[in-house]
Amino acid sequence: MSDKHINLVIVTGMSGAGKTVAIQSFEDLGYFTIDNMPPALVPKFLELIEQTNENRRVALVVDMRSRLFFKEINSTLDSIESNPSIDFRILFLDATDGELVSRYKETRRSHPLAADGRVLDGIRLERELLSPLKSMSQHVVDTTKLTPRQLRKTISDQFSEGSNQPSFRIEVMSFGFKYGLPLDADLVFDVRFLPNPYYQVELREKTGLDEDVFNYVMSHPESEVFYKHLLNLIVPILPAYQKEGKSVLTVAIGCTGGQHRSVAFAHCLAESLATDWSVNESHRDQNRRKETVNRS
């Protein structure tokens, strides 16, 4: 690998989806970072980086705050892609319309595309305009249910590697359907057909990571059959995802509340896949019911 090789991350996505937290996270990881970089200036900036011995891990926030963003972004990406000394990935941050509206109300800011002041109209227009960019992004992170701390951890897990070569990582996560589907999931599996530990009083307040809950969930005949088929489905297709250049494959397993069944299954799957692949395990909603009770 040449000393002049640059590892570039373009951070973009919906307004209000967390790009400020993201770029701060990259700075913490040792990246050279710039927020609100006009697309037309990116190629020239990268030329300057190539001519110096400065940090060659670079993260740039490029978004619609630049007035010419939608006119310039495609030609900018083409220019970057044609440079053999640059490895670049796109991180697209997203969130549901409802969550973005809530964040705008909280900050009392107006949406830059909401000409008549209606935030939701601006969000919908922005989502439509950004759809092509989202489809070409190697990393799509749904921040709807993420705290800033969780977003920072997600970015650290995906971008802290020292190598300039994009890696293939499997994100195995559990979630509760009652709290919404994870928008960044590539594969979603439903385990609500399994017996629910919630109705066992001694297991209700525990999670699928507790041994007695885990054993309860995984010992049922239906669990054994489904888990076998799950592995037989997922394992053979992993090399194909890797071959297509996908950096992160997110496998989401859901139950009603995301506390028992999905947690046990996700944990079991993560351990199985980790023997041959780089795997990160997370449980989005396992403590959500407890937090709700504590707030009441």
From Swiss-Prot:
Positions annotated to bind ATP: G13, M14, S15, G16, A17, G18, K19, T20
Function according to Swiss-Prot or TrEMBL: Displays ATPase and GTPase activities.
Annotated keywords: ATP-binding, GTP-binding, Nucleotide-binding
Name of this chain's protein: Nucleotide-binding protein MGAS2096_Spy0550
Binding-site residues, GTP: D63, M64, R65, S66
HAMAP family per the UniProt record, alphabetical: RapZ_like
Family of this protein: Belongs to the RapZ-like family.
Organism (species): Streptococcus pyogenes serotype M12 (strain MGAS2096)
